[in-house]
Amino acid sequence: LPELAALDIVETRNGRAHKNNFYHTLEVLDNLCNAQRERLNGLRHSLAEATDDAEKEQLKADIERFEAHKLWLRWGTLLHDVGKPKSKRWDNAQGWTFHNHNFIGAKMVPNIFRRLKLPMDMKMKYVQKLVDLHMRPIAIADDEVTDSAVRRLVNDADDDIDDLMMLCEADITSKNRVKKARFLENFRLVREKIAVLIKNDYERELQPCIDGNEIMELFGLKPSREVGDLKA
């Protein structure tokens, strides 16, 4: 993996150095593996405690999906910063920058998978998506957590939103406790908004496509139980 080895460098200019992104990546991967272990243990405990059949089936499905994605989420984590060497620039005001490293890294994923003879199917697309989107929750958490920004994130990440959030939470390796606490709190707010949006979307799907007034007009009915039956 020369793309990963290329991260093992620290460059200094005008007394300002960037972090070693190779060791950062290993730390993020370690954080993610610990988080996965905790999540899986939590799901298994919930399954053991569940008494409702529907809840059990849902938990079994959650565990099955989690197990299926576990390895590929680790690949996404391992490759999340591989675009940094190609995107590294020096700015006299900001110091070292890595703008668009997520986009550049995502473009590198297919070649890496092909060379390593890894699957070139949806697993590769999944890893590519994680690499591409991994800066989005961080950008949201670093600013005001708005509904519109979270909505765009949910639409783009789709069913992989929880995996993406796990990667981003693992990506917080700052030794500044105040900064780390702020990011984690904002990520908690992002997760809350995601849960609300998903719940609202689900409830909206359950709503009938037409209302009572439209039914009365369509069938020439007056307000009655029959209207309610048709609406149901």
List each model region and its residues.
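Short, surface-exposed acidic
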Residues: L1, L118-V127, K222-D229
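Core structural elements
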Residues: L1, G76-T77, V82, H134-R136, ...
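Charged substrate- and nucleic-acid-binding regions of tRNA-handling and nucleotidyl-transfer enzymes
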Residues: V109-R115, S174-A232
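Divalent metal-dependent catalytic cores for phosphoryl transfer on phosphate-bearing substrates
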Residues: N14, N20-Y23, N34, G42, ...
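Long, charged alpha-helical interface segments
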Residues: L1-E38
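Residue-level recognition of specific faces of alpha-helices
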Residues: E3, D163-M166, E226
